[in-house]
Amino acid sequence: MRHRKSGSKLNRTSAHRKAMFKNMVVSLVMHKIIKTTLSKAKALRRIIEPLITRSKVDTIANRRLIFSKTRNNDVVTKLFTQISPYFYNRPGGYTRILKCGLRKGDNAPMAYIELVERSKIKQKI
């Protein structure tokens, strides 16, 4: 029985779901905004918010934990150096979900998920 199990399965196996969210976290940190389905955006918010909260305190343990979730050193560096300073005084709610209509092919509800302080975060050239 599936009683009291939170989170949606999104019609994927657990390995596929974990890999998909790992890729989505990397894309969101690198680009600060991504377009996806509404249900994936809501599920992604539950994954990215704790990572940003962890990145506020720069310790080796937190860096290793975030690396284990993302498997990307560039993402870890960007989270700790560029993104977390803008969210230091914010207690939560680091992402915003904006609905953007329906997908043409299958009529799925689409949404943008973005970092709230996205305009202030400096782009490294």
UniProtKB/Swiss-Prot annotation:
<keyword id="KW-0689">Ribosomal protein</keyword>
<comment type="similarity">
    <text>Belongs to the bacterial ribosomal protein bL17 family.</text>
</comment>
<protein>
    <recommendedName>
        <fullName>Large ribosomal subunit protein bL17</fullName>
    </recommendedName>
</protein>
<keyword id="KW-0687">Ribonucleoprotein</keyword>
<dbReference type="GO" id="GO:0022625">
    <property type="term" value="C:cytosolic large ribosomal subunit"/>
</dbReference>
<dbReference type="InterPro" id="IPR047859">
    <property type="entry name" value="Ribosomal_bL17_CS"/>
</dbReference>
<dbReference type="GO" id="GO:0006412">
    <property type="term" value="P:translation"/>
</dbReference>
<dbReference type="InterPro" id="IPR036373">
    <property type="entry name" value="Ribosomal_bL17_sf"/>
</dbReference>
<comment type="subunit">
    <text>Part of the 50S ribosomal subunit. Contacts protein L32.</text>
</comment>
<dbReference type="Pfam" id="PF01196">
    <property type="entry name" value="Ribosomal_L17"/>
</dbReference>
<dbReference type="InterPro" id="IPR000456">
    <property type="entry name" value="Ribosomal_bL17"/>
</dbReference>
<dbReference type="GO" id="GO:0003735">
    <property type="term" value="F:structural constituent of ribosome"/>
</dbReference>
